[in-house]
């Protein structure tokens, strides 16, 4: 079974890490995979042994993805005899490319990580447009994948479309030395900080996290935020935190710098309003960190049945502040939650296990 994944960004961060790492693990298991991505230039490279063919696509994600889908068609058609499945990483924009792919004898699938219309950054008219686009796309999509049972139910309830589930995953940390000065360079205190890393977007409620941290007497604890703040929302949260020297913005981080931050934090925070299945949370859990989380279905699916997590209602500053204070004052009794978090990852969310899920689904797709 040979899969081409189409639609990743230039760097294997955030949602794109799902694409790159699933492809890499499939390749390691003997199922040839490659990734067609969009970025700032045309080039070919490798990531963990898989081919990455990148196409230059102008503009942001909303323009780059449809351009990539059309630009990549000649390559896909040319190599159709060595491709079994073309997996488009968004459902919207993939209707006609996937129809063309199927006309040339290949199978096609699409994936939904989250529903764009749920983001608070969109106004009412844009949300209506996004819902209409998704409804139209789902009508023509033959095989739809999503990343959690929660999201599958949500899509069915909202659109009447049935989805297969292939969860997100992580690689377990190894014991190799990490080559990064991100801790020293930013004046971060090891094992004395709360961490959140990811897309800086209103749906992540970072302003709530900042307010909760500032609201309680945090002593020498710090709040470290990783992600690109060069956006209107990003600049607003930097300004919001400007009167607190213990809130540190480290920018976008990946590789050893990201691992260094995860390894040395006290607790990992994710207080979003909506998620598909959050890779960022899984990464924190893989390092055995206490999860401080908002009570939303996707996070409940991961944690609630195991009775772990320090929970707050969405946008509830008081509850979140109390949870952060609990970690600071009662860490010794709460650290067992981090140990349980790592156990959950080992039993359910390693990339090896996720790749096995995809292989089973791939066989089903190939035989239909």
Task: Say what each PLM segment does.
Residues 4, 187-204, 210-214, 224:
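Conserved donor-binding/catalytic core segment of Leloir-type glycosyltransferases
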Residues 77, 103-104, 127-144:
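Membrane-proximal helix-turn-helix segments that form the acceptor-binding/catalytic region
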Residues 88-94, 112:
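Short His-centered aromatic/hydrophobic patch
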Residues 134-177:
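Donor nucleotide-sugar binding/catalytic pocket of nucleotide-sugar-dependent glycosyltransferases
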Residues 235-253:
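Nucleotide-activated donor-binding/catalytic signature segment of Leloir-type glycosyltransferases, i.e.
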Residues 273:
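Aromatic "clamp/platform" in nucleotide-sugar-dependent glycosyltransferases that forms part
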Residues 290-293:
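Short hydrophobic beta-strand element within catalytic cores of glycosyltransferases
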Residues 305-317, 326-331:
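Conserved acidic donor-binding segment of nucleotide-sugar-dependent glycosyltransferases
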């Amino acid at each position: 079974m040979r899969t081409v994944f189409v639609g990743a960004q230039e760097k294997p961060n955030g949602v794109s890490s799902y694409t790159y790492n699933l492809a890499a693990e499939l390749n390691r298991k003997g199922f040839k995979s490659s990734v067609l991505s969009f970025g700032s230039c045309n080039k070919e490279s490798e990531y963990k042994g898989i081919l990455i063919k990148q196409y230059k696509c102008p503009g942001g994600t909303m323009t780059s993805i449809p351009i990539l889908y059309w630009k990549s068609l000649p390559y896909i058609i040319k190599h159709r005899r060595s491709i079994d499945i073309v997996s488009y990483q968004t459902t919207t924009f993939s209707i006609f490319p996937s129809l063309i792919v199927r006309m040339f004898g290949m199978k096609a699938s699409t994936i939904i990580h989250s529903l764009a219309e749920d983001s608070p950054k969109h106004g009412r008219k844009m949300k209506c447009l996004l819902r209409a686009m998704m409804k139209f796309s789902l009508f023509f999509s033959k095989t739809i994948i999503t990343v959690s049972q929660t999201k599958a139910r949500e899509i069915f309830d909202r659109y009447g479309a049935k989805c297969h589930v292939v969860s997100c995953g992580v690689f377990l940390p190894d014991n190799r030395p990490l080559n990064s000065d991100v801790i020293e360079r930013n004046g971060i205190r090891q094992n004395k900080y709360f961490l959140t890393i990811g897309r800086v977007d209103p749906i992540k409620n970072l302003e709530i996290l900042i307010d909760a941290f500032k609201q309680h007497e945090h002593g020498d604890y710090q709040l470290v935020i990783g992600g690109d703040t060069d956006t209107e929302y990003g600049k607003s949260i930097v300004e919001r935190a400007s009167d607190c020297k213990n809130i540190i913005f480290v920018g976008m981080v990946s590789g050893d710098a990201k691992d260094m931050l995860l390894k040395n934090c006290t607790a990992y925070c994710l207080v979003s309003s909506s998620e598909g299945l959050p890779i960022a949370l899984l990464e924190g859990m893989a390092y055995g960190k206490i999860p401080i989380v908002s009570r939303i279905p996707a996070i409940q699916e991961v944690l609630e049945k195991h009775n772990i997590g320090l929970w707050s209602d969405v946008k509830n500053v008081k509850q979140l502040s109390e949870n952060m204070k609990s970690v600071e004052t009662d860490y010794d009794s709460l650290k067992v939650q981090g140990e349980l978090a790592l156990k959950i990852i080992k039993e359910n969310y390693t990339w090896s296990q996720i790749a096995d899920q995809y292989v089973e689904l791939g066989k089903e797709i190939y035989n239909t």
